[in-house]
Amino acid sequence: MMRVKHIAVGSRLLPLSFECKDGEVVHVVGPNGSGKSTLLAAISGTLTGRDGASGEVHVDDKNLLTLSLSEQAHVRGYLCQQSRPAFNVDVFQYLALSLPSGTAITDGKVRDAVNMVVELVQLQDKLHRSIQTLSGGEWQRVRLAGVCLQVWRTINPYSQLLILDEPAAPLDIAQEGLLYQLINAIAAQGIGVLVANHDLNRTLKHADKVLLLSNGVLHSSGRADDVLSEAGLAEVFKTQARKVMIDERPYLIFD
């Protein structure tokens, strides 16, 4: 279980606390500039006291923020929003670089994990392509595969948390479906998943818990159906939303 205690980043993110249980999928939602990316970066440990970050992130009996970067990498995976790297390798080599330290891609368990993740995000025909020749959606699927291999339990038994900052942004509708299959596979291993997300209907369907941010403040948290209420969304997003039932599932319709 992850326990976040009074995490804050200067005036960008005021102190907030919450928990993420093992295998729980928590979505962080809110308008642009509400503090979603700042919160995830602070929890990941990439923002430090020099950046104005404070608070504690406890994973089991460890404060993640006091660990070295290499120790953090064994406990959590973090996919931020970023452009393509300057170096050039093929997809298979990139995935090999993403594996936890001390593992070899020739190991049977590692090979099985790589094959499973590659199949989940449908990269089988891309393994020998240069990462610089991939489309935006293809490259994002490679990044997702890499960060998931970092925390995949059969090759990294110490992993506890996966943090994804707007992972669906470069993906089309079909690829977005693959993303949520991958998230489900990670959560099924008992790993908590923290996702910054803009598609509120996806949040209604997939999130076990939701944090709704507004101007760096935690507006509300809890079950998706409760947090994403018509009144709460109108207050935070300054727009009207209606919640309707289709095939016994709730959907949001925005004016």
Curated annotation (Swiss-Prot):
<keyword id="KW-0547">Nucleotide-binding</keyword>
<keyword id="KW-0472">Membrane</keyword>
<feature type="binding site">
    <location>
        <begin position="30"/>
        <end position="37"/>
    </location>
    <ligand>
        <name>ATP</name>
    </ligand>
</feature>
<keyword id="KW-0813">Transport</keyword>
<comment type="function">
    <text>Part of the ABC transporter complex BtuCDF involved in vitamin B12 import. Responsible for energy coupling to the transport system.</text>
</comment>
<dbReference type="Pfam" id="PF00005">
    <property type="entry name" value="ABC_tran"/>
</dbReference>
<dbReference type="InterPro" id="IPR023693">
    <property type="entry name" value="ABC_transptr_BtuD"/>
</dbReference>
<feature type="domain" description="ABC transporter">
    <location>
        <begin position="2"/>
        <end position="240"/>
    </location>
</feature>
<dbReference type="GO" id="GO:0005886">
    <property type="term" value="C:plasma membrane"/>
</dbReference>
<dbReference type="GO" id="GO:0015420">
    <property type="term" value="F:ABC-type vitamin B12 transporter activity"/>
</dbReference>
<dbReference type="GO" id="GO:0005524">
    <property type="term" value="F:ATP binding"/>
</dbReference>
<keyword id="KW-0997">Cell inner membrane</keyword>
<dbReference type="GO" id="GO:0016887">
    <property type="term" value="F:ATP hydrolysis activity"/>
</dbReference>
<dbReference type="InterPro" id="IPR027417">
    <property type="entry name" value="P-loop_NTPase"/>
</dbReference>
<dbReference type="InterPro" id="IPR050153">
    <property type="entry name" value="Metal_Ion_Import_ABC"/>
</dbReference>
<keyword id="KW-1278">Translocase</keyword>
<dbReference type="InterPro" id="IPR003439">
    <property type="entry name" value="ABC_transporter-like_ATP-bd"/>
</dbReference>
<comment type="similarity">
    <text>Belongs to the ABC transporter superfamily. Vitamin B12 importer (TC 3.A.1.13.1) family.</text>
</comment>
<keyword id="KW-1003">Cell membrane</keyword>
<protein>
    <recommendedName>
        <fullName>Vitamin B12 import ATP-binding protein BtuD</fullName>
        <ecNumber>7.6.2.8</ecNumber>
    </recommendedName>
</protein>
<keyword id="KW-0067">ATP-binding</keyword>
<dbReference type="InterPro" id="IPR003593">
    <property type="entry name" value="AAA+_ATPase"/>
</dbReference>
<comment type="subunit">
    <text>The complex is composed of two ATP-binding proteins (BtuD), two transmembrane proteins (BtuC) and a solute-binding protein (BtuF).</text>
</comment>
